[in-house]
C-alpha cells in the first residue's frame, strides 16, 4: 500500500473517533491490577495509574483534557526518562497525551493511545519551566521544513537527538514515531551507535513531537503487541520511500466503522457506563 493510501486510512481511523465515545464518561481508573487489554488502536486498560502532575523533571500539558493516565510501566518510563534528561542538564520534558482513565477510543486526535502504553512528548526541552497558561495552550515547535524533506537546521538541537535516543534505548520501548525528516536527521547524526534507530519509525505528521509506544507488559495476557520493526537501522530504501511523490491513481479508501471491542473491554463498558 502506498504512503498516500496509508495516510488516508490513518486519517479515517482518527476521524471515526470524532463521534462521542463512552470512554469519556469514565472519569477515574477502573480498580484492579494493571492490565492493558487489546491492541493499541482498539483496547482499554484496567488499573491505570495517574501520572503525577507535579514533577521537577517534567511538565504535563493540557491537563484540562485529563489524558494523563496509563499503565504503571508508562508512568515509570516517563519518570525514568525525564530524570535522565534532567540529570544531563538538557531541560524539562514536556508530556502530551497519554490515555484516558480506562483507555479506549478518543473523540478525536488519536487512533491509538487506547491501552495505556502510548505517550506523546514534545521535541523541545525548555530550560525555563513553562507557565500554567503555556501548558494549557502549548505552542508546538515545528522542526520540519515546509517541503517536508529535512529538518530546519536552526531549530534542530543536539539535545533533541539525545532525547529521542534515550527514549529508544529504554528497555520497555518498542517503537517511537517521528516525522520522516526527523528520522532522516537521526540517521545522519547517529554515527556508529545505531542499534536504537531500529525502534524509531517514520510516520505522517509528528513534526513537533515523538509518539513513544511501550511493549505489552508480560502480565497483561490480553494485550496485543505489534510485530517487531524490521531488522536494521531503517535508514535505507524504506526511509527514502517516504520522500517519493505519491503514485498516480491513488484513491481514497472507503470509510470503515471501528472494529468490535475486545470482549473484556466491552464488559468493562457495560459495567461502568450507564
From Swiss-Prot:
Domain of life: Bacteria
Signal sequence coordinates: 1-19
Residue positions binding Zn(2+) 1: 110, 113, 120, 211
InterPro entries for the chain: Hedgehog_sig/DD-Pept_Zn-bd_sf (IPR009045), Peptidase_M74 (IPR005073)
Molecular function, one GO term: serine-type endopeptidase activity
Family: Belongs to the peptidase M74 family.
Function per UniProt: Murein endopeptidase that cleaves the D-alanyl-meso-2,6-diamino-pimelyl amide bond that connects peptidoglycan strands. Likely plays a role in the removal of murein from the sacculus.
Protein name: Penicillin-insensitive murein endopeptidase
Amino acid at each position: 500500500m502506498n504512503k498516500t493510501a496509508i495516510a488516508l486510512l490513518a486519517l479515517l481511523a482518527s476521524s471515526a473517533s470524532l463521534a462521542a465515545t463512552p470512554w469519556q464518561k469514565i472519569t477515574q481508573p477502573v480498580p484492579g491490577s494493571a492490565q492493558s487489554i487489546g491492541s493499541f488502536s482498539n483496547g482499554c486498560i484496567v488499573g491505570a495509574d495517574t501520572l503525577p502532575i507535579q514533577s521537577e523533571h517534567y511538565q504535563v500539558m493540557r491537563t484540562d483534557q485529563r489524558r494523563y493516565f496509563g499503565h504503571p510501566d508508562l508512568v515509570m518510563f516517563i519518570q525514568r526518562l525525564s530524570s535522565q534528561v534532567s540529570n544531563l542538564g538538557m531541560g524539562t520534558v514536556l508530556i502530551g497525551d497519554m490515555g484516558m482513565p480506562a483507555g479506549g477510543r478518543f473523540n478525536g486526535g488519536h487512533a491509538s493511545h487506547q491501552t495505556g502504553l502510548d505517550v506523546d512528548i514534545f521535541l523541545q526541552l525548555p530550560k525555563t519551566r513553562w507557565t500554567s497558561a503555556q501548558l494549557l495552550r502549548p505552542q508546538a515547535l515545528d522542526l520540519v521544513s515546509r517541503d517536508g524533506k529535512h529538518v530546519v537546521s536552526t531549530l534542530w538541537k543536539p539535545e533533541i537527538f539525545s532525547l529521542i535516543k534515550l527514549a529508544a534505548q529504554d528497555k520497555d520501548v518498542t517503537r517511537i514515531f517521528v516525522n520522516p525528516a526527523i528520522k532522516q536527521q537521526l540517521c545522519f547524526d547517529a554515527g556508529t551507535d545505531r542499534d536504537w534507530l531500529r525502534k524509531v519509525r517514520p510516520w505522517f505528521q509528528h513534526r513537533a513531537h515523538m509518539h513513544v509506544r511501550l511493549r505489552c507488559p508480560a502480565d497483561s495476557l490480553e494485550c496485543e503487541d505489534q510485530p517487531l520493526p524490521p531488522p536494521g537501522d531503517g535508514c535505507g530504501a524504506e526511509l527514502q520511500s517516504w520522500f517519493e511523490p505519491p503514485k498516480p491513481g491513488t484513491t481514497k479508501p472507503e470509510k470503515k466503522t471501528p472494529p468490535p471491542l475486545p470482549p473484556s473491554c466491552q464488559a468493562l463498558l457495560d459495567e461502568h457506563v450507564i
